[in-house]
Amino acid sequence: MIDNITGEKERINPFFLPYDTPHYTVPFNRITLADYEEAMMEGIRREDEQIEKIINNPDEPTFENTIIPEDEVKGRKHYYDLLSRVESVFFNMLSAETNDEMDALAQKMSPILTKHGNDVSLNPKIFERVKYVYEHHGELTPEENCLLEKSYEGFVRSGALLDEAGKDRLRKLTEEASMLSLQFSQNVLKENKAYTLHITDEQQLDGLPNTAREAAHEAAKEHGLKGWVFTLDAPSYGPFMMYSTQRELRKELYMARNTLCIKDNDTNNLELCKRLINLRREMAQLLGYDTFADYVMKHRMATKVENVYKLLNDLIEAYKPKAIEEREEVETLAKEEEGAAFKMEPWDLAYYSQLLKKKKYDLDPEMLRPYLELGNVIKGVFGLATRLYGITFKENKEIPVYHPDVKPYEVYDKDGSYLAVLYVDFHPRKGKRDGAWMTEFQGQWIERDGTNVRPHASLVMNFSKPTEDKPALLRLGEVETFLHEFGHSLHGIFANTRFESLSGTNVWWDFVELPSQFMENFAVENEFLRTFAFHYQTGEPMPDELIEKVIASRNYGAATACLRQVSFGLLDMAYYTHKEEFTEDIISFEKKAWAPAIIDEQRMDTCMTVQFSHIMAGGYAAGYYSYKWAEVLDADAFSVFKKEGIFNQATAQRFRDNILSRGGTEHPMTLYKRFRGQEPTIDALKERDGLTKGQ
């Protein structure tokens, strides 16, 4: 369009136009802050129009004229589905590339978007049509049945059967919970990014490997400082806690990390957590459930709270004796080093655990870094997918990205056909939250004309950064994280379902971690390491002796690590099995809730809950146990590959066909048994963790 006064071409919001980028990828380079609000408001208006069309259809409600259109309104991220498309970009940027203006816009738009979602899910006229189809439908395919069930249950679980007073109350609860979840995340991010440990005396770097020193020197320059800067981001925090000989500095860093959001300031999350727990409890009880956990279990493989506790208690029984042995061994070494009177504190654990590992296996994780250069690791991980599934990856610099660090790849199937776009974003920066995750800018679905719309997946991580004279050299744990998130992306890349809301990672939460945790198993497999672990300077392969040490030490600390995850699961369930109003002190409650899985003396001046985004602001409320549930599945599944060959393409094809490509189109156990031939047992997990010997 041409402006009549200036004669200049009028700018059009890029969200309003069909993307003219490769594969209809997001034109990040054209999007401004103002575009988001305008597009979201227009998207709401358009969705309202679509809902009215469904409601006012004079024909008898059917699967074709009600369920499919209703699913399309709520789910698609393609160029004609404006609201879902702009939301997927905005909220992904809120985690990966945010700023104060983005945060403020999120605070403004969150209640508006929540209200719109409630307007749809609590609309009695559209529910009436969905309910009619649910009660009168004819023969449907299994996938259609799944969508119908999901649609009907979605309305019911959103309050469609409540009276008007109940609906109004539910609206208020969900709107407040949405705002508080956002505030929780923003508080954690602000406090995390605000802290730095600035060192100017080089003697205080004693014990730290060169990679940590160089990264800290780069961080200091980024902050406009001389010397070295350490932060609470994992690539900085982890090595400092493992290697620094400066006990007081370890304590300072530990306390900074573990006292986030409990100080007397405007980012304190203590009362906010109580309110979120109570909001979710009240929502669940309004919908007829005793607790929020009962509400969640309706759509979980676990099915009942009792089954979750059985898993967690079985793991405590199996792993706690070994974890106590592991801790006693670390404490014995610490006393040998420091004297019999030495009392080990939490900020000592990583340091002495690392010393013990080095003593037992003659292995220091820093010995591995030169062989784990990021470029080689990328080739190794992508090459693993090529070897298993025949797919290939091609970087396409014509695809726009949201930050120069991000690399976009096209993914092609073994027959050469286009499969997906995959973005990878590896390093920490200001405005990017801590941790690692997989997300999507576009899902997968099949159009009515048969067109298979392919996904745009993104892997976001916080790995060790390159320095002035070294490329990014990773820890083995970072390689495992890469494999984990890559496993999630394969769940999306291989998706091949008719409906987007059943596609890829749109599965029950205690099944969604199977593909990701399954991939982690390859990290310590000799055959896999030999494909990419080459010295970044000499090109020499990782020595056999070093690989043997990695494999020999694979179970080091496994019981302690298991109990840590179980403790988080216990904490999560304790909050969300609460039947009465939660009024207890968060810190005291936390220590009591996870006590059965704790083997150390507890501190009352630290708190996990206030920064536990998974269960307070993420999708894992009453669901953190899912990691251990899926670990049982992944160990059982990988045992098949160990038996048939870890690169066995026939086994991999069976995994792809029955699990990775099917999304949520059938019950997860049905899909798993079709791949495995039987239900999983805990035996493979215990064997993998060294608690039992293989048969």
What are these regions (language model features)?
Residues 2-208, 641:
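N-terminal helix-rich structural modules
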Residues 235-237, 283, 414-416, 426-430, ...:
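Short, glycine-/Ser/Thr-/acidic-enriched flexible segments
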Residues 45, 49, 53-60, 82-96, ...:
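Intrinsically disordered or highly flexible coil/loop and linker segments, enriched in small
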Residues 464-483:
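Short pre-active-site segment immediately N-terminal to the catalytic Zn-binding motif
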Residues 20-35, 88-109, 130-172, 229-271, ...:
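Short His/Asp/Glu-rich catalytic/ion-coordination signatures at enzyme active sites or charged loops
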Residues 78-92, 149, 153, 255, ...:
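Short, hydrophobic/amphipathic alpha-helical patches that form generic packing surfaces
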Residues 3-38, 42, 229, 376, ...:
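C-terminal, non-catalytic "cap/extension" segments appended to globular domains
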Residues 143, 147-149, 186, 190-231, ...:
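Active-site-proximal, well-structured secondary-structure segments within enzyme catalytic domains
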